[in-house]
């Protein structure tokens, strides 16, 4: 029996789904991502969503201004799709290298999504343009109808929105983001090379019992919501299989402590500080460390048609405690796994 690895050396990873927010929050959270990842797909759901090239350029600069000296980090900007978005504006942003992808939020599916798309038909001309451009569509895959149970929203989305869309636009590149169900895992596995998925650390590590049994744990509350154990296991098996169209997307989504620990708390896990080590722990538990680098560093660039990062990151088997909180100007952030010990940490 061989001794377990003490060091994991991988190509520098990318985060294909992150929320960096704005203002003081942005300045606080950006370094946790820029220190580790070469690139990150930045979500556009600010209070005033990023729907124009100029807005994306300005936001990108605010992000870059928050990157500490010595960090080599490139934010990849996305356009927030709305019913009224101009396809020419989207194409201009893509050709000018401002927009890497566009994001489809069903209206009111998650934080700051009230401006989202009311129906796919409303944006079909934009999606047709994206298909011609080879521009990826990033999808929050949940229906938001009041009569659909929150635990069924993803599976229903596949049947009523995702599959009809992909039948209609057969060469549109689609990333099914933060998948949470065995239905989505099977759907992506059965799909063609134009369909990929991101998976978060929390959906690999936890299920809804972890959030709800023995007291409500608001810092595990995110959208899409944690599902049953059978769904968690399906996600773990997907990544452990070495499936090449699944890749790292933390969906790190910071909210101040008082907005999480309240009678009507916000959805989102701020997992940037511990995400890479969390993924490593899952792959180790699944005896799948041979596929860890591809998930973190190779599969995403392959799908997006981008080069693999040239640098390297080392994780060491060195137990460290995640901070209980991180200071904000007028509050604090409670990170994912706060106060808990993680067995893999990034070598500084």
Curated annotation (Swiss-Prot):
Catalysis performed (reactions): (S)-dihydroorotate + H2O = N-carbamoyl-L-aspartate + H(+)
Keyword Zinc: yes
Top-rank taxon, per record: Bacteria
Annotated cofactor note: Binds 2 Zn(2+) ions per subunit.
Sites where the protein binds substrate: 19-21, 45, 140, 223, 255, 267
Pfam families hit by this protein: Amidohydro_1 (PF01979)
Pathway(s) annotated for this protein in UniProt: Pyrimidine metabolism; UMP biosynthesis via de novo pathway; (S)-dihydroorotate from bicarbonate: step 3/3
UniProt binding sites for Zn(2+) 1: 17, 19, 103, 251
Keywords: Hydrolase, Metal-binding, Pyrimidine biosynthesis, Zinc
Gene Ontology annotations of biological process type: 'de novo' pyrimidine nucleobase biosynthetic process; 'de novo' UMP biosynthetic process
Active site, renumbered: 251
PTM sites of type N6-carboxylysine: 103
Gene3D superfamilies: Metal-dependent hydrolases (3.20.20.140)
Cofactor needs: Zn(2+)
Alphabetized InterPro entries for the sequence: Amidohydro-rel, DHOdimr, Dihydroorotase_CS, Metal_Hydrolase
GO cellular component: cytosol
Enzyme class of the recorded protein, top EC level: hydrolase
Coiled coil regions in record: none
Record has Zinc as a keyword: yes
Positions that bind Zn(2+) 2: 103, 140, 178
Biological role stated in the UniProt entry: Catalyzes the reversible cyclization of carbamoyl aspartate to dihydroorotate.
Database matches in NCBIfam families: pyrC_dimer
Subunit structure: Homodimer.
Identification of the protein by name: Dihydroorotase
Organism: Salmonella paratyphi C (strain RKS4594)
Record lineage: Bacteria, Pseudomonadati, Pseudomonadota, Gammaproteobacteria, Enterobacterales
């Amino acid at each position: 029996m061989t001794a377990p690895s003490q060091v994991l050396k991988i190509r520098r990873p990318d985060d294909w789904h992150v929320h960096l927010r704005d203002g003081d929050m942005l300045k606080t959270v950006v370094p946790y991502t820029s220190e580790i990842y070469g690139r990150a797909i930045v979500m556009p759901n600010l209070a005033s969503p990023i729907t124009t090239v100029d807005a994306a350029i300005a936001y990108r600069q605010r992000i870059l201004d928050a990157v500490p000296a010595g960090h080599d980090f490139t934010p990849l900007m996305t356009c927030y799709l709305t019913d009224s978005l101009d396809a020419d504006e989207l194409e201009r942003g893509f050709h000018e290298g401002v927009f890497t992808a566009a994001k489809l939020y069903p209206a009111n599916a998650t934080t700051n999504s009230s401006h989202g798309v009311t129906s796919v038909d409303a944006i079909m001309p934009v999606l047709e343009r994206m298909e011609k451009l080879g521009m990826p569509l990033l999808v929050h895959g949940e229906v938001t109808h009041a009569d659909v149970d929150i635990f069924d929203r993803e599976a229903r989305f596949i049947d009523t929105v995702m599959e009809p869309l992909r039948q209609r636009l057969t060469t549109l590149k689609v990333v099914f983001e933060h998948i949470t169900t065995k239905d989505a895992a099977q759907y992506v596995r059965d799909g063609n090379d134009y369909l990929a998925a991101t998976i978060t650390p929390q959906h690999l590590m936890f299920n809804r019992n972890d959030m709800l049994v023995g007291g409500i744990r608001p810092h595990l509350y995110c959208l899409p919501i944690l599902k049953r154990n059978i769904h968690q296991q399906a996600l773990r098996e997907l990544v452990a299989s070495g499936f090449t169209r699944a890749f790292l997307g933390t969906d790190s989504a910071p909210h101040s402590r008082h907005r999480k620990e309240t009678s009507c708390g916000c959805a989102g896990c701020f997992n940037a500080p511990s995400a890479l080590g969390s993924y490593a722990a899952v792959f180790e538990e699944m005896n799948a460390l041979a596929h860890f680098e591809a998930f973190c560093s190779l599969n995403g660039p392959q799908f997006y048609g981008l080069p693999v990062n040239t640098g390297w990151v080392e994780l060491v088997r060195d137990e460290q405690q995640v901070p209980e909180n991180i200071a904000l100007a007028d509050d604090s952030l409670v990170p994912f796994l706060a106060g808990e010990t993680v067995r893999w940490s990034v070598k500084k």
